[in-house]
Amino acid sequence: MDIPNTTATIATIPQAPAGFRSGFVAIVGRPNVGKSTLMNQLVGQKIAITSPVAQTTRNRLQGIITTPSSQIILLDTPGIHKPHHELGRVLVKNAIQAIHSVDLVVFLVDSSATLGRGDRFVVDLLQKTDGPVVVGLNKQDQQPPDQREELNASYETLTENHGWPCFKFSALTGEGLSNFQSALEARLDPGPYYYPPDLVTDQPERFIMAELIREQILLLTRQEVPHSVAIAIEKVEETPERTNVFAAITVERGSQKGIIIGQKGSMLQAIGTAARQQIQKLISGDVYLKLFVKVEPKWRQSRQQLLEFGYRVEE
């Protein structure tokens, strides 16, 4: 994976040819509609973590798609939901801000389910933006065959009422995404390269490492633990033989620490093994991963601790 160094890579940004299109595209929607899966498929490699747990995405992550004719910068935003703590409020605020700071918005829905209250809440937000909106009917592969026509029609009626074009695809299988990507490109104005052509994300390597560790916690632990977890990469050591990564897992309660560690350390070992394998894929080399767990009560309610964990917190 090509990881950015902003000051070092500015000189490598070429001049765009005539007719080149570029712009920023926010992917928004309620939790668990497949925003991160869509980002990974369009970019062509895994830069955003995925899991069945709602609010998996916490930071606004950019994925960069560069072709000979365009550069599309995708913003994978946290799922828009009713927040219950300071972290949740920060996540939703960041997602809403993205709607008003991009050239195009993709409103992503789970077309295998009926239109819900969460989707309608996003629709209400999108009505307040002046920019163009397209709708992605994701999870076409998961629609019950006998309900496909009815489900698609309900979403198409909604989008037609607002003048938003509608596209059907499966982010999981990739079916329909080629046409969708072409549609995004066609809706962008002529513009420059914003990033070097070989870059796929704006996030540093340590951020991706931390997210890969958090992903395994989301996948392997109980429902009550994932939302209370934060990861900090304390140190990365490069040696000729391998990369040594030291990471702290922060939870809010001692009981959650016990769940993360598991009986005789079994859960922590499972998390570490799975995360190490993913990090090795990321950096294409051998990795030693050392994890330790600590308790910080109510860290999600603390603006200072949210800042320390790298979340965008604005007044």
UniProtKB/Swiss-Prot annotation:
UniProt-annotated binding residues for GTP: 29-36, 76-80, 138-141
Region of interest (G3), residue spans: 76-79
Chain intervals for the UniProt region annotation (G2): 55-59
Keywords recorded for this protein, A-Z: Cell inner membrane, Cell membrane, Cytoplasm, GTP-binding, Membrane, Nucleotide-binding, Ribosome biogenesis, RNA-binding, rRNA-binding
Keyword Ribosomal protein assigned: no
One Pfam family from the record: MMR_HSR1
Domain Era-type G: 21-190
Gene Ontology molecular functions: GTP binding; GTPase activity; ribosomal small subunit binding; rRNA binding; small ribosomal subunit rRNA binding
Annotated spans, G4: 138-141
Region G1, residue ranges: 29-36
KH type-2 domain segment(s): 221-297
Annotated localization: Cytoplasm; Cell inner membrane
Keyword Membrane (UniProt): yes
InterPro entries referenced in this protein's UniProt entry, alphabetically: G_ERA_dom (IPR030388), GTP-bd (IPR006073), GTPase_Era-like (IPR005662), KH_dom-like_a/b (IPR015946), KH_dom_type_2 (IPR004044), KH_sf_prok-type (IPR009019), P-loop_NTPase (IPR027417), Small_GTP-bd (IPR005225)
Renumbered residue ranges of the record's region G5: 169-171
SUPFAM superfamilies membership: P-loop containing nucleoside triphosphate hydrolases (SSF52540), Prokaryotic type KH domain (KH-domain type II) (SSF54814)
PROSITE patterns linked to this entry: G_ERA, KH_TYPE_2
CDD domains: Era, KH-II_Era
Cellular component terms (Gene Ontology): cytosol; plasma membrane
Any one biological process term the GO annotation gives: ribosomal small subunit assembly
UniProt main location, coarse: cytoplasm
Assembly behavior: Monomer.
NCBIfam families noted in UniProt: era, PRK00089.1, small_GTP
Function: An essential GTPase that binds both GDP and GTP, with rapid nucleotide exchange. Plays a role in 16S rRNA processing and 30S ribosomal subunit biogenesis and possibly also in cell cycle regulation and energy metabolism.
Protein family per UniProt: Belongs to the TRAFAC class TrmE-Era-EngA-EngB-Septin-like GTPase superfamily. Era GTPase family.
Identification of the protein by name: GTPase Era
Name of the gene: era
